[in-house]
């Protein structure tokens, strides 16, 4: 739910600060809080625990999460929060393709069906936007940013899972957040934060900072206790939450949150995309449970 609400709120925070500054402060706040918590409990990562493999995985995770954060944030200047989260469903498919191409995993029939549904759903979702996409204007730029951010996030997802054999989830996040904050420091303008005068925008800004800590902390813990497929089932529902939060936001504060520009075909397309992602990551489990019940 925190990931589902994030683009809705971040789009407002980006009216006060630019994307690199927002991404930098999110990483900085999260790393400082985690440093204090792990320091108090004596669970800070030790230098002796590092190896060439873990350092490589850390760099991979830093690249994945840093690029994802900034590309999606920049994309929100051009497209709606719901669009970013529908495109987020490219992540599980990219993860599957990495597994097939790199780790020689099988490409199951459920994954093939899921891929077909994803492509069909995306065509339906963008049914009234093809003119804007093919004109390669600002809307197309936003779509390409969000799509690229979703696919490169897989670098973080793979790194997080492999690093969990050596560190706990909070240690991994601390190292990735801390290093990522330095990546964005040269591009950030901290003075923008001091000039946020609107209390509503301040609230959105603070929420974005806390969201990083809560959302990725929960994701990391979930990977420690669940199979990756179970975690993926939950993440496929993110666009649904985003659509709900966008609708609620517009009804409560129409001056801040814009009305949805989606038609009925787009809504159906979004659901088809979610269904495709769900089948791809857990088709056999979901259908097996369904067949047992009937």
Which residue stretches match the model-derived regions?
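Specific transmembrane alpha-helical segments of multi-pass solute transporters/efflux pumps
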Residues: 2-9, 39-88, 123-124, 208-226
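Transmembrane alpha-helical segments that form core, pore/gating elements
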Residues: 8, 34, 95-97, 101, ...
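Transmembrane alpha-helices of multi-pass small-molecule transport proteins
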Residues: 16-67, 94, 98, 151-155, ...
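Juxtamembrane helix-entry segments on the extracytoplasmic side of multipass membrane proteins
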Residues: 16-24, 49-55, 127-150, 189-206, ...
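Helix-helix packing/entry segments at the starts of transmembrane helices
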Residues: 25, 65, 69, 83-90, ...
């Amino acid at each position: 739910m925190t990931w589902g609400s994030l683009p809705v709120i971040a789009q407002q925070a980006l009216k006060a600060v630019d994307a690199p500054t927002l991404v930098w402060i999110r990483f900085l706040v999260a790393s400082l809080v985690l440093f204090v918590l792990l320091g108090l409990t004596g669970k800070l990562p030790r230098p002796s625990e590092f190896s060439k493999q873990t350092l490589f995985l850390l760099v991979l995770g830093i690249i994945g999460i840093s690029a994802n954060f900034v590309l999606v944030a920049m994309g929100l200047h051009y497209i709606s929060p719901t669009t970013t989260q529908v495109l987020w469903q490219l992540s599980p498919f990219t993860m599957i393709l990495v597994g097939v191409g790199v780790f020689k995993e099988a490409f199951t029939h459920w994954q093939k069906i899921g891929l077909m549904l994803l492509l069909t759903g995306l065509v339906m979702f963008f049914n009234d936007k093809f003119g804007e996409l093919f004109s390669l204007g600002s809307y197309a730029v936003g779509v390409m940013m969000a799509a690229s951010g979703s696919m490169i996030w897989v670098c973080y997802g793979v790194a997080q899972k492999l690093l969990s054999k050596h560190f706990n989830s909070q240690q991994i996040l601390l190292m990735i957040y801390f290093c990522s904050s330095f990546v964005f420091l040269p591009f950030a303008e901290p003075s923008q934060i001091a000039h946020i005068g609107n209390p509503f925008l301040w609230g959105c800004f603070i929420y974005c900072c806390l969201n990083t800590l809560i959302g990725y902390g929960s994701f990391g813990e979930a990977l420690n206790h669940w199979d990756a497929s179970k975690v993926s089932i939950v993440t496929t529902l993110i666009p649904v939450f985003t659509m709900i939060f966008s609708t609620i936001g517009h009804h409560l504060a129409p001056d801040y949150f814009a009305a949805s520009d989606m038609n009925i075909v787009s809504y159906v397309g979004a659901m088809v995309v979610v269904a495709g992602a769900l089948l791809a990551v857990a088709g056999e489990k979901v259908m097996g449970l369904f067949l047992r019940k009937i």
